[in-house]
UniProtKB/Swiss-Prot annotation:
Tissue and organ distribution: Expressed in testis.
Protein name as catalogued: Melanoma-associated antigen B3
Biased composition regions of type Polar residues, renumbered to the chain: 18-33
Keyword Glycoprotein included in the entry's annotation: no
Encoding gene, per UniProt annotation: MAGEB3
InterPro entries assigned to the protein according to its UniProt record, in alphabetical order: MAGE, MAGE_N, MAGE_WH1, MAGE_WH2, MHD_dom
Protein's GO biological process: negative regulation of transcription by RNA polymerase II
Signal peptide: none
Organism of origin: Homo sapiens (Human)
One Pfam family it belongs to: MAGE_N
Amino acid sequence: MPRGQKSTLHAREKRQQTRGQTQDHQGAQITATNKKKVSFSSPLILGATIQKKSAGRSRSALKKPQRALSTTTSVDVSYKKSYKGANSKIEKKQSFSQGLSSTVQSRTDPLIMKTNMLVQFLMEMYKMKKPIMKADMLKIVQKSHKNCFPEILKKASFNMEVVFGVDLKKVDSTKDSYVLVSKMDLPNNGTVTRGRGFPKTGLLLNLLGVIFMKGNCATEEKIWEFLNKMRIYDGKKHFIFGEPRKLITQDLVKLKYLEYRQVPNSNPARYEFLWGPRAHAETSKMKVLEFWAKVNKTVPSAFQFWYEEALRDEEERVQAAAMLNDGSSAMGRKCSKAKASSSSHA
């Protein structure tokens, strides 16, 4: 990383740490005054169906204190199906819903079943880094549900994004081809470690969101409280995210996406999480807030206090980039003059 960029990042982190020490207090005062305090729960609950309460009730949740956001997302991507892809036959008997709530609805609702099958197909194509053709997705949906394909594709895309942090993007409208793109650059296609597994990007974005909303620094207790709402427990291997403690305190820390440190002067020792340098480099507060908003089926500005901070962060990034470009241009001009001067003396 260039020296100028490092110094800019260091300066921004110092400002964030200073701001974070007072943000919880300031946020409480602001939200108490405006009566818009948001007591949030995990936006990503893995279960059997996508549950959604009325829009009116969701709006009221943002206005009343001590109320969690009304909209939660539950995704069941269980499957047991053989199908033919572009050039290969993929046979799978696996379930993402082990130990979760009942999948009775997913077994009786044909649209949910087709959505789950399409999610499995998309995940296989993502792991193999193969292009995705609309014709192949239609084979998964089959003729009986061809008319429902747009709705099924929309739901499958949503599930891929909020659970795994992977976006489905159309790359060629003439050939109806798509590609899956991770929201961040975690190694091994998002699985972090080599071998079998699923992308951890969605979980990382959730953790970054908690840290941001807790004043840019979240205690370990608050992180586990949040993860428990996602049915992810300390010491219990998760069917998608693996061993959670190792993932969040070792793997993501080693990769510099998270910082895990002891709370100053704590006795007995307590620990807290912050954004790591790679998180600052690969995403932003606004992008994380947009992710949370999408999961909760709302808009970033619904999180008013954090939205305003995210806007300030975006402005700081633009200014830092402009300063870096100005510095690079000045250095380039200086080098050009030096070369011209040496040539004239030759």
